[in-house]
Regions:
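Sec-dependent, cleavable N-terminal signal peptides
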Residues: 1-6
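Divalent metal-dependent phosphoesterase catalytic cores across multiple superfamilies
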Residues: 7-188, 192-195
Length: 195
């Protein structure tokens, strides 16, 4: 019997290592599959870039695709291909940073010690959605990538860094609406224990 396995998205796309001319898009699937991002200046996504993946936990794979030759301070739209074009992520956007010589102002979000607290297990989700996203949308713009340049989380992202499911359920899932549009810069603390 031939069984078909459908690739599932385990961690929604998130952005890292933004430069004026490039952006890294990462995500995780439960099985091995290709690493493809469709992207463009407009929602019809005229470009496609292939990256690579590596083993994470069990059969899961972390995918990384570097989008290059981008223009500084420019909005791009993207989505990831899940499996072999079986499905797609939602459509997201990001804005590349301006050239450093422009000395443009920018806003960041910095928060630390976001690990789950058993007495208040939904606090990180509340901070992301009720705090950051709602506040930024009301004060600056509904377009998060236009309003924020980066998210900095210096330490203690999860309680136990060696626990695979804490990363998935306690960090990436609550932050996914923000991390898919604004580059994430985590710094490991003592709770991550060199994970």
């Amino acid at each position: 019997t031939n069984l078909l396995f459908s690739v599932e998205l385990v961690v929604e796309p998130y952005l890292q290592n933004a430069t004026p001319n490039s952006m890294h898009v990462l995500w995780e699937t439960d099985l091995n599959s290709q690493s493809v991002v469709e992207w463009g200046l407009y929602v019809f996504l005229s470009e496609s870039t292939t990256g690579s993946s590596f083993s994470n936990y069990g059969s899961s794979r972390i995918h990384t695709v570097e989008l290059t030759n981008l223009e500084p301070n420019t909005q791009y739209y993207y989505r990831i291909v899940v499996g072999n074009y079986e499905s797609y992520s939602d459509l997201y956007s990001f804005i590349t940073p301006p050239e450093p010589s422009s000395e443009a102002d920018f806003r960041i979000v910095a928060m630390s010690d976001m690990q789950r607290d058993s007495s208040n297990p939904n606090k990180f989700n509340e901070i992301i959605h009720d705090g950051v996203i709602d506040y930024v949308s009301e004060q600056y713009s509904d377009n998060l990538s236009e309003a924020l340049a980066m998210v900095l989380v210096p330490g203690d992202l999860v309680v136990t860094g060696s626990s695979y499911y804490q990363w998935q359920d306690h960090f990436f899932e609550p932050g996914s609406d923000l991390f898919a549009q604004v580059p994430l810069y985590p710094v490991f603390g003592n709770h991550e224990a060199n994970s």
